[in-house]
Amino acid sequence: MAEDSGKKKRRKNFEAMFKGILQSGLDNFVINHMLKNNVAGQTSIQTLVPNTDQKSTSVKKDNHKKKTVKMLEYLGKDVLHGVFNYLAKHDVLTLKEEEKKKYYDTKIEDKALILVDSLRKNRVAHQMFTQTLLNMDQKITSVKPLLQIEAGPPESAESTNILKLCPREEFLRLCKKNHDEIYPIKKREDRRRLALIICNTKFDHLPARNGAHYDIVGMKRLLQGLGYTVVDEKNLTARDMESVLRAFAARPEHKSSDSTFLVLMSHGILEGICGTAHKKKKPDVLLYDTIFQIFNNRNCLSLKDKPKVIIVQACRGEKHGELWVRDSPASLALISSQSSENLEADSVCKIHEEKDFIAFCSSTPHNVSWRDRTRGSIFITELITCFQKYSCCCHLMEIFRKVQKSFEVPQAKAQMPTIERATLTRDFYLFPGN
């Protein structure tokens, strides 16, 4: 009797865990995962597939769900254990220390309950969970991610912690209408988008960048939601940062990608990003010029004609970038003129050495950038918010301008994000969800 109740309890756990997944048709993901990993034989797989000879559709669906749940229970230790660990390891689920200990020590059946409880508490985690399942197999194109719950208005007008997706119809309309004006987007099943995050938080001679881990988590989740596989590195010297950038530029996945993001967060000076060994008497700096050289068309042909977006969160000097003025008409603008020249050039084939770049820096030259110890950098926080709200309908330059506009009125701590070395020749839409 006790044994039967134990089985019922386990069954209940798995049913609760996969209720939403079964209703959404994501059982196809599990079937495909089993086929790839040869978890069960063809006979076992067939028990998950409805019998097409059955006459009653409702009976067929009920039988299918019962068989699926039963099979999932049978395969739990082989498949789901790996899924749970993957989610915890990649910070899809944010568990408190006591929850983590309980999670790793408990049985597979109870891990399902912990997972469900965590998802219920956090709507974003629920969406990330679904997106992670889909990202684990990018070739499943018949299943629409549950992230597309944004068809209606959000829970509140000010809700900004959810990535809004671009409806498929709008994506197709914009691609058709502005075909020659936008960067082409590769099909989801054919592309491998990569993004790199380098964040230095601990230094040998400089203060620690407290709160920077919020920036890492936020940017990583944003980029993953936009379809990028994220490589993240922490606490590197300038030489190590350069080595990581060169290795990243050489990745073969860029050939099948349509764009890339580089996110660099550290202390900084006007000319570049500080490495962990930096001090005034002995600088340890990765120059911005070096970054552009590594990814230009001479050294990184795999990203030729593809947007290369560089996000920089770092001080660029020690000034505060603010001043007090009276309300008065603006001063006369300085007018510069340049005499025309007769230019001639002969070449069989020519390409620009530096093209399709755009850098977005957290402050203007010579000025500081601000970071909140409890929330992360002000610039990165606002950047993530604007991407979440506007990447569904705006191209990259429009999103960057919206970030700048949010800093238009100086607050207690003033800074003005700056777009630099922009050589994009088309509009770059991210079309999240497509």
Curated annotation (Swiss-Prot):
Induction: Up-regulated by bacterial lipopolysaccharides (LPS). GO terms for biological process: apoptotic process; cellular response to mechanical stimulus; positive regulation of inflammatory response; positive regulation of neuron apoptotic process; protein maturation; proteolysis; substantia nigra development. The two subunits are derived from the precursor sequence by an autocatalytic mechanism. It catalyses: Strict requirement for Asp at the P1 position. It has a preferred cleavage sequence of Tyr-Val-Ala-Asp-|- but also cleaves at Asp-Glu-Val-Asp-|-. It comes from the Eukaryota. This is Caspase-5. The active site is at residues 267, 315. PROSITE patterns: CARD (PS50209), CASPASE_CYS (PS01122), CASPASE_HIS (PS01121), CASPASE_P10 (PS50207), CASPASE_P20 (PS50208). Belongs to the peptidase C14A family. Expressed in barely detectable amounts in most tissues except brain, highest levels being found in lung, liver and skeletal muscle.
